[in-house]
Amino acid sequence: MAAITLLRSASLPGLSDALARDAAAVQHVCSSYLPNNKEKKRRWILCSLKYACLGVDPAPGEIARTSPVYSSLTVTPAGEAVISSEQKVYDVVLKQAALLKRHLRPQPHTIPIVPKDLDLPRNGLKQAYHRCGEICEEYAKTFYLGTMLMTEDRRRAIWAIYVWCRRTDELVDGPNASHITPSALDRWEKRLDDLFTGRPYDMLDAALSDTISKFPIDIQPFRDMIEGMRSDLRKTRYKNFDELYMYCYYVAGTVGLMSVPVMGIAPESKATTESVYSAALALGIANQLTNILRDVGEDARRGRIYLPQDELAEAGLSDEDIFNGVVTNKWRSFMKRQIKRARMFFEEAERGVTELSQASRWPVWASLLLYRQILDEIEANDYNNFTKRAYVGKAKKLLALPVAYGRSLLMPYSLRNSQK
């Protein structure tokens, strides 16, 4: 699930030398070769363009459910109604959920397509997955520990997804980022297309290619993540939260959509597939918003401001205030509003975590609890995210692990709700 968005954190160190060379090789080596009307009405009543709502009121006799669509429409300065980013992303969610539901239906036995074009040595796939696990352990220790409770197939698949996402992220955030161009990302996307058709370029690609032959994973979230990297190359400001939401989906929400088919839904869950995907998306958005709020000063030093420009203006703040990095009452008030929004996304995500397969819940809960604590640390720093970097200490991380494990044993929320 979106807990794997730990890989998107700007705080993570660079890749090992070997993996960094892989990122640089992209440029050199690769160059060689809408819902029904009734629901719309309720959505307009409950939701705003500024803050996420926690769900849609259930109709009589229905189980309460969450929805990621906080406003299905937004209005331009000219007064024209356009589809919001939330609605666009929700359309992707529906597609992913439909794919998983088709996969869960009884199917005639077929032999999966295994990557053939890569000349792997004997036990090559085993070695490829092992290397993916090593990378995950090195850069996301807490999450890696949680994956050890999963079945072997699921564990290895999550490692493979993690590594692809990390390599993609390193293209624009890693040591070779200054050499990456839009055409390099185009070549990376071509390489993605190849591995989805069983033609991986290297050992790490082969692990992901094998994974997608075993699970109903769609290529769209992967393409969308690459689009997020393109956005980082050309865009340094976001006019409003609608724009920022789309960016957060591209670089973090996508990971949740990639991961749900692997992590699986608990057989006893009464939640809809769509609601589980929606919660995975919400966790990705929450984690990325947390990254943004933690890294305001660091991003400003790179000339980037990942904050809604219209909300900054409403708070009486400007880009100059961000670059000056002085904590004022205006800044504190603005940050309280941003933190509130991020917490609302975390709250929406919580219900969905309980619906996952029990063996998959621990790493997701661990990520959720640890990332949410970063918001507490920002508050503890008196909202100084210009010169102080909020982080969760080792002691708090260790304390969070048993709490996360305990929550992973809880009955799915949908089952508890249906018994009331």
Swiss-Prot record:
Transit peptide: 1-70
PANTHER family, A to Z: BIFUNCTIONAL LYCOPENE CYCLASE/PHYTOENE SYNTHASE
InterPro entries from the UniProt entry: Isoprenoid_synthase_dom_sf, Squ/phyt_synthse, Squalene/phytoene_synthase_CS, Trans_IPPS_bact-type, Trans_IPPS_HH
CDD domains, alphabetized: Trans_IPPS_HH
Record's protein name: Phytoene synthase 1, chloroplastic
Major location (coarse): plastid
Function: Catalyzes the conversion of geranylgeranyl diphosphate to phytoene. Mediates the first committed step in carotenoid biosynthesis.
Matches recorded under SUPFAM superfamilies: Terpenoid synthases
Family: Belongs to the phytoene/squalene synthase family.
Any one biological process term the GO annotation gives: carotenoid biosynthetic process
Pfam families: SQS_PSY
One GO cellular component, as annotated: plastoglobule
Species, as recorded: Oryza sativa subsp. japonica (Rice)
Keywords attached to this entry: Carotenoid biosynthesis, Chloroplast, Isoprene biosynthesis, Membrane, Plastid, Transferase, Transit peptide
Inducers of expression: Induced by salt stress and abscisic acid (ABA) in roots.
Tissues in which the protein is found: Expressed in leaves. Highly expressed in developing leaves. Expressed at low levels in roots.
